[in-house]
Amino acid sequence: MRLISLLIIVPLVYSCKKDQPEPIPIDISLSSGLVVLCEGLFQQNNATLSWINTGTGGISNDLFEEKTGRHLGDTGNDLKKYGGKVYIVVTLSSTIEVMDATTFAPLKQIEMLNGTVAKQPRSIAFYGSKAYVTCYDGFVDVIDTSSLNVVQRIPVGSNPEGLYIANNKLYVSNSG
């Protein structure tokens, strides 16, 4: 009886294996899918940028790391496309990541520091050739979208959060 049990159990155990799902090839282009920014957990440095191909259902759960070889950072808060570029605002890392909107190739990491103090950028809006970024240090930083350099700082009060541009005016909401 013991031999029969072994003859049944041994082949069953060795025939079991985990199936590895075939990766679904994904065509990465803004016209064929969605980009999703996941904020990540506070102070865990695990924000991600995912890609969902709406035609095939293919998903890339960390497109940013695939394209750059590094983590996006801590607390991704805003994502906008403007002028052929994608801008990702990462608050606690105090960076703005700029990528090509077609290929998602990295173009520049803009460090948002005042000396060595983190500005903690929050939101971004665009007008003309400028990007406007709220920073928790009480300013809106103006970035030239060609050079990708900060060209001006505008004082706006405590903890600016959102911003909106209409009729040649910049509106900023403060939370402090």
Q: PLM ranges: what are they?
A:
Residues L12-S15:
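C-terminal motif of bacterial Sec signal peptides marking the signal peptidase cleavage site
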Residues M1-L7:
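Sec-dependent signal peptide recognition
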Residues K17-G176:
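Predominantly soluble domains enriched in secretory-pathway, periplasmic, or organellar proteins
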